[in-house]
């Protein structure tokens, strides 16, 4: 049987897990739970704007661990891919404004498009925004999603695929986010983490 959690000093709570709460309610609730960190989903900062949301977060004393989510790079047309890149640059700016050192990337996929094509578009998209992320002092983290999301959410479904993208990018600005919900099944999970 698992031990009861008694030390929350390293606990970070994601605002999506308390979705009905506003950012202010989440901040108050997390502090009451003695959590020290917060990961913010973009929809929770939208009602305030990044500047005001950043002030709320700074005033709270919580450590902003990351901003979710960027990504969604694949598209069937070049104009749509460039629009996604520009949106990711705005997301990086939001992360900087709220004090998040990291943007989690849900990389995207296009239904009916071969996943290899989508992965190449993901690679190209991340590569295009890395200079902006570096300038902003914000890191990017590829989050592989469970294969059930491969059709329209992410063509990156294993940690190996994410690590291969990172290797190809060759940038210290890019890493991975390992979510047990999405990767528990991966037979190479432990070796890919190492």
Kindly give the residue locations of the regions a language model identified.
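Short, acidic/polar
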Residues: 18-30, 49-53, 82-93, 186-193
